[in-house]
Amino acid sequence: MKLPVVAIIGRPNVGKSTLVNRIAGDQQAIVFDQPGITRDRTYQPAFWCDRDFQIVDTGGLVFNDDSEFLPLIREQALIALAEASVAIFVVDGQGGITAGDREIAAWLRQQNVPILLAVNKCESVEQGILQATEFWELAIGEPFPISAIHGSGTGELLDAVIKYLPPAAEIPENEEIKVAIIGRPNVGKSSLLNALTGQQRAIVSPISGTTRDSIDTLIEREGQVYRLIDTAGIRRKKNVDYGAEFFSINRAFKAIRRSDVVLFVIDVLDGVTEQDLKLAGRIIEEGRAVVLVVNKWDAVEKDTYTINTYTKMLQDRLYFMDWAEMIFVSAMTGQRVTKILELVDIAAESHRRRVSTSVINDVIEEAVKWHNPPTTRGGKQGKLYYGTQVSSQPPTIALFVNDPQRFNDNYRRYIEGQFRQQLGFKGTPIRLIWRGKPAREVEKTVNRATKV
């Protein structure tokens, strides 16, 4: 069952994201001294007085301006209110009531959701009482003086919040799969997210760089829960200005690290760019499972051999990621989008799989039988004694040999290929650790290892 939602509403730069971070206890929403940083609605898990819920941050509301993304932000706020059990209307206690506050208050009174009024930036109790009194004028209800940055008053606010949450219900335990949607700007990441969730979840615009936050969405398919993380497009460093975009890209890299599977989105019209190659290297470096999602397939003129031609072209560029499943989709039309989660399941299973030592050594024995380890120019041959899996996510196998330097790159790739051929590991990198071990020590451990 989905957790109840608490929406945060207000005009730009009143401290909404700071309040979200205070309640959620994590620095997830971007906080930067520039109005209008949050565009999408972003969800974070929160807990208060034995109650779990989700706190949703929304973009700054402006009603007298239809430029840029402002109409889309209003639409996102309306969606957040529709799914919320209660909303917190945040105002700036230091700046006092503005025309924008009055417009938002009038709009909120028309919505069918309870509203709590949080007067932020009240940095002392005495000051807060005086500042909050002015906001009775908005006719929203009792104003709660708070300091989101220091935490004062937020406990009383949350006490009021949980009174509006529905009764706690048991949530069935189900290990979620965390899926980061990663790619260059404007390759269709947010459109893909919307296609997967079936609703207008993230702001979609033809303007490059619309998504600034890493935003989480929970969806369920056939009993499996997925946490979808949409992120800002990743640009070359020289094209990034210090500020909100810098923090967004940093957040995208963090999203890769906290994911189980990365949907690596590529624009089929652009092919694999140099920036894509660097991004692919970053994903592998973090050891994440991958599904290659080739988007905008609807824009390609096709014949019988088109998909084979494009597959070979992309595989040639991403040869070092040949273990990743590839799927051609159109986020715009929904073509093949539903099959993406099937590939995510396969990649996630491979990513967390553990294989017994006996099975690993069966693979090694068979591999060595077909292709002996190389011999150095000095006539010294490499010996591969045994192996054991030391960790998962990604699968990591320690191989004990007489001298790691006797195993060249070709043979190492051969051994990795044998593990993939015999054990699968579709969609995930695997790491092989080559460890030197004297023969006398091997005699003490090899028999024990092969019986595990």
Swiss-Prot record:
Binding site for GTP 2: 183-190, 230-234, 295-298
Keyword annotations from UniProtKB, A to Z: GTP-binding, Nucleotide-binding, Repeat, Ribosome biogenesis
CDD domains, sorted: EngA1 (cd01894), EngA2 (cd01895)
Any one GO molecular function term: ribosome binding
Keyword Repeat attributed: yes
SUPFAM superfamilies recorded: P-loop containing nucleoside triphosphate hydrolases
Domain KH-like span(s) in chain numbering: 353-438
Residues forming coiled coils: none
Domain of life of the native organism: Bacteria
EngA-type G domain: residues covered: 4-169, 177-352
GO biological-process terms attached to the record: ribosome biogenesis
Binding site for GTP 1: 10-17, 57-61, 120-123
Keyword GTP-binding included in the entry's annotation: yes
InterPro entries on file: G_ENGA (IPR031166), GTP-bd (IPR006073), GTPase_Der (IPR016484), KH_dom-like (IPR032859), KH_dom-like_a/b (IPR015946), P-loop_NTPase (IPR027417), Small_GTP-bd (IPR005225)
Any Pfam family hit: MMR_HSR1
Self-association state and partner proteins as the record states: Associates with the 50S ribosomal subunit.
Biological role stated in the UniProt entry: GTPase that plays an essential role in the late steps of ribosome biogenesis.
Assigned protein family: Belongs to the TRAFAC class TrmE-Era-EngA-EngB-Septin-like GTPase superfamily. EngA (Der) GTPase family.
UniProt protein name: GTPase Der
